[in-house]
């Protein structure tokens, strides 16, 4: 880990994907610089901004002004906030706005929002005119460290989360750390679950650093930028090695198989559970299941749980408000998850902190038994 200095210097993470390479800029004041940064990289001078009703009042005017100053004409569509926006209905609304704005293939779609807006906007950018340029301006911690990087886009289906989508890499990611100051504590904590995930995958030193420095990350400044940059670099490394999720990129789904099932079980109701909270519970369950399978020490699961509890994240299914369906229904959601190949359950399990691996033949009977223990 880099030493923390008092001055929050901006950082750049480069994602080397050949002709589709791009930069992730991380630091304060980037929305004000967005127009100049986009104009220096893209030839088109038309943009469609896709945002939501929570983010638009805070940052849309500043983004439009920045684009105007750089000679980029823009039109915006404001969608409802929340996971349920990832639907065909709202996807078509977004696509219509891109076409209405006459954005050509050298123009761009700009996602101004959190993970939901980024996922939907990237999907729209990937299918309109068979692909237009795409810029991410993520406004949540979760989006800055996870969903804005890597090119996975999509919407939800009644069968599960993110099951319909395309790979469409952004041309630029502008992670303005100033916008994180407007997040609620719950939203920031939810994003932090994805930060911790990178340490648990294969960076034990980073996880230890987070255990020691998480309060500084929550406060802001240099520690926050360092945590975001380290997370983005970790994801970029995995994406470059396995862009289309044919192998090791699946490691990024640590905690997500259980987490997605819990999100589905709560009908994506953010009052009960948001994505990062599901991932938090899912990462603890993944470590506990690994211990049950004699792959890891129970002490590791307890260490993960202690840290996530310390930052205020839920770590147990019992902490989710309201009733959850029985283990068999959760198992059905797991089986529908996209991390299933040939009918075999694929989980990201662990041999210890920072020692995660892809297990592609997990017995369903063991999972059902485990879920019954955790959710009688």
Swiss-Prot record:
Catalytic activity: 7-phospho-2-dehydro-3-deoxy-D-arabino-heptonate = 3-dehydroquinate + phosphate
EC numbers: 4.2.3.4
The record's free-text note on cofactor binding: Binds 1 divalent metal cation per subunit. Can use either Co(2+) or Zn(2+).
Protein name: 3-dehydroquinate synthase
UniProt-annotated location(s): Cytoplasm
Source organism of this protein record: Rhizobium etli (strain CIAT 652)
Entries under InterPro entries matching the protein: Dehydroquinate_synthase, DHQ_synth_AroB, DHQ_synth_fam, DHQS/DOIS_N, DHQS_C
Pathway(s) where this gene product acts: Metabolic intermediate biosynthesis; chorismate biosynthesis; chorismate from D-erythrose 4-phosphate and phosphoenolpyruvate: step 2/7
